């Protein structure tokens, strides 16, 4: 007599055969073989952002990530995400989908990449949880192109939840270190996608504006023989049998290009600062947007050109990136960025007077601390209703050796900083273009003349008066969007405690 287990097996076998026979959709779903460029295909993949009412009733192919999946009886709802856009997809038992296909779709791991064929259908009620609110995709085929591991280091829904909402409702949010440790996942969120698309827009607008103004884009060396700012905060690297340094700025080379008659130059590239500053706004490596320009009679010609460039960037961002701004504001609410035309300019002594009136004790030659910068930003916003302004005529004592002194006041300099929401985003000045005065100032700052000989020599053969400035890309992005930490606007941030990923 057969055992109970043998009897069960004999009963299961016909059921398996029957189930396989019932799976009439088995060719319509599954795990695809790895794409190794085996063959080319004429299949057209439609972008999720293009799934609109205009495509209603069309059959389309889409490649996207599985953001969420939810099984409900004989159907499964998926949210398919592609960058910052997403659409609801429905897999339901019917002519094109078997119950096995529905079960397969419901069990695809989050963040897996899938190819889906489906019919675009107009919905009667807007799908508020998706960017594509007027349509959904009725799935006919679904294949996994790249399977994600079942356990994610962070949940994307948690990563985009406003902190206030998480605190009020007791729901999970994701802390900064977890985000940065798993940066590739964090960068997939709609907020991160919006931040870095807007940041790309800043670079594009900077380049576009300056080229239209007649500037030439240059590239400068990042491995240099002497500290470009003359300070100690440099990274030393081994350079064959000598030591070299990572450039703190392209300053000296921008000026050399002006001496070489390029007249107006700019560059976009990495800047390195070996400062042990663990603050919300400091990085050891960031992207510098640098400008240098010859002028005719007064350095304000350059200062005003830079200010206008910033205004053109702000205008361009507000015109072209409203969707991204609104996406970031959902998670990090913020007042819209305000600026004036022409840009507000105050002299440093006027800023000191405002701070002293507010109870701050400062000497005439003291530099602004971060708290005082922020306070000044609030005072200026209250008085002038602008988030962007210039402080001019800084004390000479707090500026680099190559800064031109003010001929009318030896304690002041022809230098300026630009601010957004009470934080400095640009430092600039007229440069010393006379080799004798430059030598004197370098010695005053204790700089080894031998290490900057090529720089000083470049002024010995005739140099036009010139000025410029350097902007921190990550800070501009952070402050325009009203974010609170520069690590949110650095794709893979470097600070004194972080060297990976």
From Swiss-Prot:
UniProt catalytic activity: tRNA(Asp) + L-aspartate + ATP = L-aspartyl-tRNA(Asp) + AMP + diphosphate
Organism: Pongo abelii (Sumatran orangutan)
GO biological process: aspartyl-tRNA aminoacylation
Gene giving rise to this polypeptide: DARS1
InterPro entries, sorted: Aa-tRNA-synt_II, aa-tRNA-synth_II, aa-tRNA-synth_II/BPL/LPL, Asp-tRNA_synthase_2, Asp/Asn-tRNA-synth_IIb, NA-bd_OB-fold, NA-bd_OB_tRNA
Descriptive protein name: Aspartate--tRNA ligase, cytoplasmic
Modification Phosphoserine occurs at: 249
Subunit composition and interactions: Homodimer. Part of a multisubunit complex that groups tRNA ligases for Arg (RARS1), Asp (DARS1), Gln (QARS1), Ile (IARS1), Leu (LARS1), Lys (KARS1), Met (MARS1) the bifunctional ligase for Glu and Pro (EPRS1) and the auxiliary subunits AIMP1/p43, AIMP2/p38 and EEF1E1/p18.
Family: Belongs to the class-II aminoacyl-tRNA synthetase family. Type 2 subfamily.
Role summary: Catalyzes the specific attachment of an amino acid to its cognate tRNA in a 2 step reaction: the amino acid (AA) is first activated by ATP to form AA-AMP and then transferred to the acceptor end of the tRNA.
Higher taxonomy: Eukaryota, Metazoa, Chordata, Craniata, Vertebrata
This enzyme's EC code(s): 6.1.1.12
Modified residues (Phosphothreonine): 52, 500
């Amino acid at each position: 007599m057969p055992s109970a287990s043998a009897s069960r097996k004999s009963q299961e076998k016909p059921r398996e055969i029957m189930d396989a026979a019932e799976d009439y959709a088995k060719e319509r779903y599954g795990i695809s073989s790895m794409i190794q460029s085996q063959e080319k295909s004429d299949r057209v993949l439609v972008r999720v952002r293009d799934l609109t009412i205009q495509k209603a009733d069309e059959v389309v192919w889409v490649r996207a990530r599985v953001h969420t999946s939810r099984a409900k009886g004989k159907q499964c709802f998926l949210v398919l995400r592609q960058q910052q856009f997403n659409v609801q997809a429905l897999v339901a038992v019917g002519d094109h989908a078997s119950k096995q296909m529905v079960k397969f779709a419901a069990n695809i791991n989050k963040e897996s990449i899938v190819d889906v064929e489906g019919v675009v259908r107009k919905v009667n009620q807007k799908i508020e949880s998706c960017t594509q609110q007027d349509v959904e995709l009725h799935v006919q085929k679904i294949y996994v192109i790249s399977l994600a591991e079942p356990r994610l280091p962070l949940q994307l829904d948690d990563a985009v939840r406003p902190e206030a909402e998480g605190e009020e409702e007791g729901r999970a949010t994701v802390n900064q270190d977890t985000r940065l440790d798993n940066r590739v996942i964090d960068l997939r969120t709609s907020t991160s996608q919006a931040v870095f698309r807007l940041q790309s827009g800043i670079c594009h607008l900077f380049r576009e504006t300056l080229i239209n103004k007649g500037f030439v884009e240059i590239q400068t060396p990042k491995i240099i023989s002497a500290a470009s700012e003359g300070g100690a905060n440099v990274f030393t690297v081994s350079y064959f049998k000598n030591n070299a340094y990572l450039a703190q700025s392209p300053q000296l080379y921008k000026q050399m290009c002006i001496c070489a008659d390029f007249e107006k130059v700019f560059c976009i590239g990495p800047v390195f600062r070996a400062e042990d500053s663990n603050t919300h706004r400091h990085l050891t490596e960031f992207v510098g947007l640098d400008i240098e320009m010859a002028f005719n009679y007064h350095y304000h010609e350059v200062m005003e050109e830079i200010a206008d460039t910033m205004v053109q960037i702000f205008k361009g961002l507000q015109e072209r990136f409203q969707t991204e701004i609104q996406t970031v504001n959902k998670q990090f609410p913020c007042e819209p960025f305000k600026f004036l035309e022409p840009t507000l300019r105050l002299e440093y002594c006027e800023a000191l007077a405002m701070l002293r009136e507010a109870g701050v004790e400062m000497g005439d030659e003291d530099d602004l601390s971060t708290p005082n910068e922020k306070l000044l930003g609030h005072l200026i916003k209250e008085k002038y209703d602008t988030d962007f302004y210039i402080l001019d005529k800084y004390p000479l004592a707090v500026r680099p050796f190559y800064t031109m002194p003010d001929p009318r006041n030896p304690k002041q300099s022809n230098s300026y900083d630009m601010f957004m929401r009470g934080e400095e985003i640009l430092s600039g000045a007229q440069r010393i273009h006379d080799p004798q005065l430059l030598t004197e100032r370098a010695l005053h700052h204790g700089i080894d003349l031998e290490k900057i000989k090529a720089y000083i020599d470049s002024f010995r053969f005739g140099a036009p008066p010139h000025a410029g400035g350097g902007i921190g890309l990550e800070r501009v992005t952070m402050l325009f969007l009203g974010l609170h930490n520069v690590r949110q606007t650095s794709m893979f941030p470097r600070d004194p405690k972080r060297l990976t990923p």
